[in-house]
């Protein structure tokens, strides 16, 4: 491999890791005991007004749990039962999975938009 090509590959890979803004969801993995409430964190530094929480069960598509267009206001999505949210800051939209939620395996996704 020539030095020019190697240099380009290294610079491209370094550039791919540079991010000015983003959305962070935590924890990455979570195991919950039956009857236990747990809270998933969602933080964004993109200055987006709208934030969303989705759930995906194995073999299914994404389903909207809750969404928020502005601070201190949020609406239920298609499957809000067994969940609660708050939106005290523009940057944050935590989701609490309550003990009423029975299905043990799911993928949760937080998103934001302008």
UniProtKB/Swiss-Prot annotation:
Give any single GO term for biological process: cell surface receptor signaling pathway
Cysteine pairings via disulfide bonds? 42-110
Instruction: Tell me where in this chain the Ig-like domain is found.
Output: 22-114
Kindly state which keywords UniProt assigns to this record, in alphabetical order: Adaptive immunity, Cell membrane, Disulfide bond, Glycoprotein, Immunity, Immunoglobulin domain, Membrane, Receptor, Signal, T cell receptor
From which residue to which does the signal peptide run?
1-21
**One family name in Pfam for this protein:** V-set
PROSITE patterns (UniProt xref): IG_LIKE (PS50835)
Name a single GO cellular component. Answer: alpha-beta T cell receptor complex
Domain of life where this protein originates: Eukaryota
Q: Which residues carry attached sugars according to the database record? A: 37
Compartment(s) of residence: Cell membrane
Function according to Swiss-Prot or TrEMBL? V region of the variable domain of T cell receptor (TR) beta chain that participates in the antigen recognition. Alpha-beta T cell receptors are antigen specific receptors which are essential to the immune response and are present on the cell surface of T lymphocytes. Recognize peptide-major histocompatibility (MH) (pMH) complexes that are displayed by antigen presenting cells (APC), a prerequisite for efficient T cell adaptive immunity against pathogens.
| Subunit organization | Alpha-beta TR is a heterodimer composed of an alpha and beta chain; disulfide-linked. The alpha-beta TR is associated with the transmembrane signaling CD3 coreceptor proteins to form the TR-CD3 (TcR or TCR). The assembly of alpha-beta TR heterodimers with CD3 occurs in the endoplasmic reticulum where a single alpha-beta TR heterodimer associates with one CD3D-CD3E heterodimer, one CD3G-CD3E heterodimer and one CD247 homodimer forming a stable octameric structure. CD3D-CD3E and CD3G-CD3E heterodimers preferentially associate with TR alpha and TR beta chains, respectively.
What is the name of this protein? T cell receptor beta variable 19
